[in-house]
C-alpha cells in the first residue's frame, strides 16, 4: 500500500533495493512508521517502541511539534542546559544552551566564572542592519537602468508603507534602497539592494515580504517606463541575505597576565603567549581557522537553538563574514598589551 507495484528497480549493490514510495506525505504518522520499520529497520519489533517513546505525553503539544515540519514520525531531543556566571555589560545573566556535545556547557560556565571577577564580558554593537535583494537581469544599456531607477524609486518606497508600518513603530523598517550594477560579475545582472532594521527580530518574513512587494512594484513601473531599448528587466528572485556584515557585535574580555596562574604546569605568561599565537595561526591558516571557528560556533549554535532561532542562518552568515576579505580566517583576535 502506497508503493508502486510490478516495476523493476535498479540499484547499486551497496544500497538496499526497494521501490519508491508514492504519496508518502498522505500516509498517517503510524503508517509512515510502519513503512520506515519495514523498509529500513528490518521489521524490528523494538523500532516502533523506540520511536514512540520519544513522543510527548501531552497530545496537543505533540501535535504542535508535528506541525513544525513535514513527515514527522518522532521527536529528536537535545539536552537543554544552563551556563551561569555570565557577567555581560555589568549584568549577571544565565545563558540557555541546547547541544548534544559534552563539555561545551561546562567549558562556557567555567570561562564565565573565571571572567566574573575580572570585569566580565564587554560588548560593542557595531551595527544591526540586515539586507536583501531583488535580483534582476537586463541586457540593455546601464544608463537605461539608472534612468528607470530614478523614475521608479519614489513609488517603490511608497508601496512599502503598509508593510513597514508595524516595524516602524518599533524603530525599524527599510532603511536604504539602491540599484547595484553587477554586470562586471555576470552579464546583464543588476540588483535592488535594500537594508533593514528589524530590532529584536531576525526579521526573515518581514524582509522577504518587503522584497516581494518591491519586485511587484518594479514590474509595474517597468511596464510604464518608455526608456528601455531592450526588453524590460526580468525579476529572477526576491530574497533576504543571510550575509550581514553590517550586523556585528564585538565582545571582549581582558585581565592581567599574572591573574591567569599556572595551568597544567604551564605558567600564565607561557599560556597567554601560546594562546595568542594559536589565534594568530587561525587568522592566517584556513586549515586551523575552520576548526577554531567550529569551536566558537559550538557555543553560539547552542544558544541560538535554545532560544528557538535559525542556527543555519547564523552559521552561513558567520562563515561568510570570516571569509569577507577573500580568505577564511579566525573570528577572534587575541592581543598581549605591554
Go through each PLM region and give its residues:
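A structural-propensity feature for long, helix-poor, extended segments
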Residues: 121-150, 322-338
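Acidic/polar, glycine-rich intrinsically disordered N-terminal extensions of enzymes
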Residues: 15-93, 97, 101, 121, ...
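Short glycine-rich or small-residue beta-strand-to-loop segments that form or flank ligand, phosphate
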Residues: 69, 91-98, 133-140, 191-201, ...
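Short beta-strand elements
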Residues: 82-88, 179-184, 188-198, 251-261, ...
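Conserved alpha/beta core surface patches that mediate binding of polyanionic ligands
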Residues: 66-78, 109-121, 158-184
Amino acid at each position: 500500500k502506497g508503493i508502486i507495484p510490478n516495476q523493476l528497480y535498479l540499484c547499486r549493490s551497496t544500497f538496499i533495493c526497494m521501490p519508491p514510495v508514492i504519496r508518502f506525505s498522505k500516509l498517517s504518522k503510524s503508517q509512515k512508521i510502519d513503512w520506515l520499520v519495514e523498509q529500513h529497520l528490518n521489521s524490528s519489533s523494538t523500532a516502533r517502541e523506540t520511536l514512540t517513546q520519544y513522543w510527548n505525553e501531552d497530545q496537543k503539544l505533540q501535535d504542535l511539534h508535528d506541525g513544525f515540519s513535514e513527515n514527522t514520525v518522532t521527536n529528536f531531543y537535545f539536552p537543554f542546559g544552563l551556563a551561569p556566571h555570565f557577567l555581560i555589560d555589568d549584568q549577571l545573566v544565565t545563558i540557555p544552551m541546547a547541544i548534544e556535545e559534552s563539555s561545551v556547557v561546562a567549558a562556557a560556565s567555567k570561562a564565565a566564572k573565571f571572567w566574573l571577577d575580572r570585569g566580565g564580558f564587554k560588548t560593542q554593537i557595531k551595527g544591526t542592519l540586515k539586507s536583501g535583494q531583488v535580483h534582476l537581469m537586463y541586457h540593455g544599456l546601464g544608463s537605461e537602468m539608472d534612468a528607470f531607477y530614478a523614475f521608479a524609486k519614489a513609488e517603490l518606497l511608497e508601496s512599502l508603507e503598509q508593510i513597514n508600518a508595524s516595524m516602524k513603530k518599533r524603530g525599524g523598517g527599510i532603511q536604504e534602497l539602491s540599484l547595484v550594477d553587477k554586470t562586471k560579475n555576470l552579464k546583464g545582472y543588476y540588483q535592488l539592494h535594500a537594508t533593514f532594521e528589524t530590532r529584536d527580530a531576525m526579521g526573515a518574513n518581514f524582509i522577504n515580504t518587503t522584497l516581494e512587494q518591491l519586485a511587484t512594484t518594479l514590474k509595474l513601473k517597468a511596464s510604464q517606463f518608455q526608456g528601455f531599448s531592450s526588453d524590460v528587466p526580468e525579476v529572477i528572485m526576491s530574497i533576504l541575505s543571510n550575509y550581514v556584515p553590517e550586523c556585528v557585535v564585538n565582545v571582549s574580555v581582558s585581565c592581567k597576565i599574572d591573574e591567569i596562574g599556572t595551568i597544567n604546569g604551564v605558567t600564565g605568561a607561557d599560556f597567554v603567549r601560546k594562546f595568542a599565537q594559536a589565534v594568530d595561526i587561525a587568522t592566517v591558516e584556513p586549515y586551523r581557522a575552520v576548526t577554531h571557528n567550529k569551536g566558537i560556533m559550538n557555543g553560539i549554535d547552542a544558544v541560538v537553538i535554545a532560544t528557538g532561532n535559525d542556527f543555519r542562518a547564523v552559521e552561513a552568515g558567520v562563515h561568510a563574514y570570516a571569509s569577507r576579505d577573500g580568505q577564511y580566517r579566525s573570528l577572534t583576535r587575541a592581543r598581549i598589551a605591554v
